[in-house]
């Protein structure tokens, strides 16, 4: 079983022989407490490193274990692309790009570029991101003529990847 606690901000994690202890603060009341658990799952996404246990057995905590990658998705009206369900494509650099039809729109993504700002600086969608995905669409659907005016929405997110020094995102 599990206990889910809403509005609780994790301020620390400790490991011990029987599992772990998580220090939390109630975001509404400001009350602090700790929670003991047989198993602690750190599912904090791009913030995962900030919640490593203080006695983490991985050695040097100053060396980043993760590399953040920015991923951008575009949304176009469904009628602009001949996609009934899903299509996997390749961009000019060989990366996979998908188009997924859902409801009245089609989602197109994703980019994979290095994000150096840290998780506290959420990435923005840039003109270069949009152009990259539109070029991928044009490679596979040249007759569709999808352009910047067809993008009705977009968003960027962060993916935590295992840090591999010297490897591009």
Positions of PLM-derived features:
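A conserved short coil-to-beta-strand element within the FAD-binding core of flavoproteins
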Residues: 6-21
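Short, hydrophobic/aromatic-rich segments at coil-to-beta transitions
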Residues: 18-23, 83-85
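Beta-strand residues in well-ordered beta-sheet regions across diverse protein folds
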Residues: 23-25, 109
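Core beta-strand elements of the Rossmann-like FAD/NAD(P) dinucleotide-binding domain
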Residues: 28-39, 43
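Flavin (primarily FAD) binding-site architecture
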Residues: 42-59
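C-terminal catalytic lobe of FAD-dependent flavoproteins
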Residues: 56-108, 113-169
